[in-house]
Amino acid sequence: MVLTTSKQPRKQRKALYNAPLHARNKLMSAMLSKDLKEKYNKNALPVKTGDTVKILRGTFKGIEGEVSKVDYKSYKIYVEGAVNRKQDGNESLYPIHPSNVMIVKMDDSDDRRFKFSNK
């Protein structure tokens, strides 16, 4: 999905900032594990709440957990297990970009999500 044809970084950033919700959903895609790739014949699918993902990059590399929240405004997901400890002892979920995770197990409660496999 092309948001803009410009090469200018400022216009690329502006296109991401002003992107409609259906385009943001597509941009929130993460790669699938090997067995899911074979099963669905797709390399990547949008991340949804309830999916189990493995973090591949960053401080929390190697952690596997369930997606508890997907933030379409900031293009981030929140994974259980990737937490920051605050000064007062509380824990807060750490935001992670979906390009840095791999979907290991998908939440199959939504039938519309798998309608592409009928084609």
UniProtKB/Swiss-Prot annotation:
Q: Does the keyword RNA-binding apply?
A: yes
Which keywords belong to this entry? Ribonucleoprotein, Ribosomal protein, RNA-binding, rRNA-binding
Entry's transmembrane regions: none
A Pfam family that the UniProt record links to this protein: Ribosomal_L26
Q: Does the keyword tRNA processing apply?
A: no
- Molecular function in Gene Ontology: rRNA binding; structural constituent of ribosome
User: How does the record describe its quaternary structure?
Assistant: Part of the 50S ribosomal subunit.
**What this chain does, per the record?**
One of two assembly initiator proteins, it binds directly to the 5'-end of the 23S rRNA, where it nucleates assembly of the 50S subunit. Located at the polypeptide exit tunnel on the outside of the subunit.
Q: What is this protein called?
A: Large ribosomal subunit protein uL24
Q: Which organism is it from?
A: Methanococcus aeolicus (strain ATCC BAA-1280 / DSM 17508 / OCM 812 / Nankai-3)
